[in-house]
């Protein structure tokens, strides 16, 4: 399991789409530009959903890891 340095973390475990993406969007309003956000989720769609979200919003999708039942995604604002 890779551990990436991150500045902030949100736990969306147990929440279904589109709630995790909404939580990320809300968190991005409150953190400084350049910050790395770690997103912990149980929804298997989170990786592709966040990849697409980052592309549309000019944020950077950094990496992800899967350690079932958790999906962990790192994105930069």
Where do the language-model regions lie?
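An N-terminal amphipathic alpha-helical segment
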Residues: 2-31
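Intrinsic-disorder/low-complexity, polar/charged segments enriched in Ser/Thr/Lys/Arg/Asp/Glu/Gln
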Residues: 7-9, 36-38, 70-72
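Hydrophobic residues in beta-strands and at strand termini
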Residues: 12, 41, 75-77
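Amphipathic, hydrophobic secondary-structure cores in small proteins
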Residues: 23, 27-59
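C-terminal structural segments of small proteins and small subunits
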Residues: 51-77
């Amino acid at each position: 399991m890779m551990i990436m340095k991150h500045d902030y973390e949100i736990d969306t475990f147990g929440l279904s789409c589109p709630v995790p993406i909404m939580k990320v969007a809300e968190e991005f309003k409150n953190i400084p530009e350049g910050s790395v956000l770690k997103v912990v989720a149980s929804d298997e769609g989170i990786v592709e959903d966040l990849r697409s979200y980052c592309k549309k919003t000019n944020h950077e999708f950094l990496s992800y890891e899967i350690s079932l039942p958790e999906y962990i995604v790192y994105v930069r604002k």
